[in-house]
From Swiss-Prot:
SUPFAM superfamilies: IpsF-like
Binding of 4-CDP-2-C-methyl-D-erythritol 2-phosphate, residues: D10, V11, H12, H36, S37, D58, I59, G60, T134, T135, S136, E137, F141, R144
Alphabetized GO MF terms: 2-C-methyl-D-erythritol 2,4-cyclodiphosphate synthase activity; metal ion binding
CDD domains (alphabetical): MECDP_synthase (cd00554)
Name of this chain's protein: 2-C-methyl-D-erythritol 2,4-cyclodiphosphate synthase
GN (gene name): ispF
One Pfam family linked to the record: YgbB
Keyword Lyase applies: yes
Quaternary structure (record): Homotrimer.
Taxonomic superkingdom: Bacteria
UniProt similarity note: Belongs to the IspF family.
Reported function: Involved in the biosynthesis of isopentenyl diphosphate (IPP) and dimethylallyl diphosphate (DMAPP), two major building blocks of isoprenoid compounds. Catalyzes the conversion of 4-diphosphocytidyl-2-C-methyl-D-erythritol 2-phosphate (CDP-ME2P) to 2-C-methyl-D-erythritol 2,4-cyclodiphosphate (ME-CPP) with a corresponding release of cytidine 5-monophosphate (CMP).
Catalytic activity: 4-CDP-2-C-methyl-D-erythritol 2-phosphate = 2-C-methyl-D-erythritol 2,4-cyclic diphosphate + CMP
Ranges in coiled-coil conformation: none
Organism the protein comes from: Cereibacter sphaeroides (strain ATCC 17025 / ATH 2.4.3)
Length: 159
């Protein structure tokens, strides 16, 4: 049995807006996130974790930010592509774990909806997906509420 684990990390700065996209859920917030696509930091980190487990680079390899067709793109496109690569390579997703790092918005109340959204996009049962949050105890750029960071891990199995 081939077991693979990949890690992903992403960060986006706050900018103008009235919401952020996190793990496929529109979360009301007094600022938005700045990015080439919809800046869904959770989906970006998770997508990179999957590509890492497959040893297939990162989002930038598959969807170059220099390509204007990806400007403002929904991050579900990237995650769906990564899931397609899992299937094409004969793997299945065993588990994924997403940790959002921010002071605000508060993630806890939204985590169940984020798990459901990711499960629907990825075509897996919600029990294979963890979404949680932590703060940086007011330290660094997330502590100063300048942006949101995310780390994700994906474990893949091939029988």
């Amino acid at each position: 049995m081939d077991i693979r684990t990949g890690n992903g990390f992403d960060v986006h700065a706050f900018g103008p807006g009235d919401h952020v996209w996190l793990c496929g859920v529109r979360v009301p917030h007094h600022r938005g996130l700045i990015g080439h696509s919809d800046a869904d930091v959770g989906m970006h980190a998770l997508t990179d974790a999957i590509y890492g487990a497959l040893a297939e680079g990162d989002i930038g390899v598959h969807f170059p930010p220099s390509d204007p067709q990806w400007k403002g793109a929904a991050s579900r496109i990237f995650l769906e592509h990564a899931m397609g690569r899992i299937a094409a390579r004969g793997f299945t997703l065993a588990n994924c774990d997403v940790t959002l790092i921010c002071e605000r918005p508060k993630i806890g109340p939204m985590a169940p909806a984020m798990r459901e959204a990711l499960a629907a996009i990825m075509g897996v049962e919600v029990g294979r997906i963890s979404v949680k949050a932590t703060t940086s105890e007011k330290l660094g750029f997330t502590g100063r509420e300048e942006g949101i960071a995310c780390i994700a891990t994906a474990t893949l199995l091939q029988a």
